[in-house]
Amino acid sequence: MANMRMDKNPMPEQDPQVRKRNFDEVALGYTKEMAIDEAKRCLNCHNMPCRSGCPVSVRIPEFIAKVAEGDFDAAYDIITSTNSLPAVCGRVCPQEKQCESKCVRGIKGEPVGIGRLERFVADYHMAKADKPEIVPPESNGHKVAIIGSGPSSLTCAGDLRKMGYDVTIYEAFHKAGGVLVYGIPEFRLPKDKVVAVEVENLKKMGVEIVTDAVIGKAMTIDELFDDFGYEAVYIGSGAGLPQFLHIPGENLLGVYSANEFLTRVNLMKAYRDDYDTPIKHPKVVAVVGGGNVAMDASRVAMRLGAEHVYITYRRGKEELPARLEEVEHAESEGIEFMLLNNPVAIHGDENGHVTGIELQKMELGEPDEKGRRRPVPVDGSNWILDCDAVIIAIGTSPNPLIRSTTKGLETTKKGGIQADENGQTSREGVFAGGDAVTGAATVILAMGAGKTGAKSIDEYIKSKSK
């Protein structure tokens, strides 16, 4: 019988005053009882509107029905038939803008907690001692190279391996996972408990992962074809090049890109005493930006011991691009929002250290091409926010290394690789997807592109083999 309660089961969490000083996971996950109760809120709609909002087409009502029955193993099999990274998606996907936004229960009340249920199923499976052994699919004799090991690449690799392809991932860093390991903090996405397990599952399927391999430097795409015998290449190298404000003072000591700041903490473990990664522990931090990365950077700064952390954003709260959940978590941990303020300069002392950031107050004008109201400067409203560190989190773009070393690879005006709706680039046999094409976007959209790329590569190689 359906549970007609209007609200979701709340997600158990660490107390904000405790968690803001540790890197343990904030959301603690559903119990079995909570998961079954939440699953019974699903109406099992025949037309499955929720599935249309999922970039990897998870059979949502089907897996939720199995959760409601207490058959968590069957639920896991349903999810992983289309999603190679369920424990990741259950934690970081913006479900409120995707599957849950389509949920019929959300018309009157809150939608079903689809993401929370997906996470529960994945965590239940990982915790099982008697998991069935992963059996690698038989090889079909065709080789594919994948550049990068973020969500797009991991998804593409998993799908291709299921089809029988011999897949090798080339990762520039010393650890696989891409943005999942260097960009998203431990307290949102545990690295050993979740990411490493998902990567290891792919290895058990037969995916080979080569780390410390910078394509475009150690070897080129042409060499992957000519010297290593790959029949297709998928570029999923992400968007790791930080964007800056281009204002006075950006070269002062204490100014970080969010990319560098988070990489030091997440990948290089600067927050742990048993690592010697250098990082500053500022007392007052200004973070520029309003997306999920800005929320992550601000919350990390608080956990490193900052007394005050401010997020400066040139629009209002309704225009913040970050997930509502991330904004609420930041606020509850004491992060202060300086909305309708735009940075115009960073100030420093005679030794070149940051002492403050100069902000100009803004008003909201007419909507821009994306429908968000444009920020309009208020004359004579400049003021200085005292701080000893500034973290710039206004976006990233694809690294130019691959495109600069690959002849005939067309790119967009913003530096992304030009690819059609099937992931095909201007080079025969070269496909691309995720942030390397679109610029910085969500994990699940990158995964959707990886699935598309795998399907296209399969069709391409089969057409060449006829």
Where are each of the predicted segments found?
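FAD-site-proximal beta/loop scaffold in flavoenzymes
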Residues: 251-282, 367-440
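A conserved FAD-binding loop/helix module that cradles the flavin
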Residues: 436-464
